[in-house]
Amino acid sequence: MKTTMNNEMKNMIVGKRVYYALTNNVKARDDDSVLYIDVLKQYGCSTNMRATTLEKRVSEGVLPSRDTVTRYRRYLQRVDETLRGTLWNKRQAYASVVRKSI
């Protein structure tokens, strides 16, 4: 029970940080790398952190994974049109074409 509550709290915090990044950094709306760096900065991470240190902190659950941040971006952009970047409509149109070809 306690672990579930901790995970829910962590997810809520990640979601808020992704939302903050999307509202304050227009480039983050179309570029997941920019978004992830912005979120990591909110956790107090340096931009010249070693990759091994980053991976260790992600595996320990101290930092969110890149996939988690991307999922939150997709969710937030789906439910809030103001957070969508210039590429959002292009991605949706392409996804529609791919679905039809399958």
Residue ranges and their predicted role:
Residues E81-V98:
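Short Lys/Arg-enriched helix C-cap and helix-to-coil transition segments
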Residues K2-M5, T70-R74, N89:
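Short Lys/Arg-rich cationic patches that frequently serve as NLS/NoLS or arginine-rich RNA/DNA-binding motifs
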Residues K2-V34, D38, Q42:
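Positively charged, polyanion-binding regions of nucleic-acid-associated proteins
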Residues N25-V26, Y43-T47, L76, D80-L83, ...:
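Short, flexible helical or helix-coil boundary motifs
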Residues T52-E81:
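Major-groove recognition helix of helix-turn-helix-like DNA-binding domains
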Residues M1-M5, R99-I102:
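Short intrinsically disordered terminal tails
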Residues D31-E60:
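DNA-recognition alpha helix
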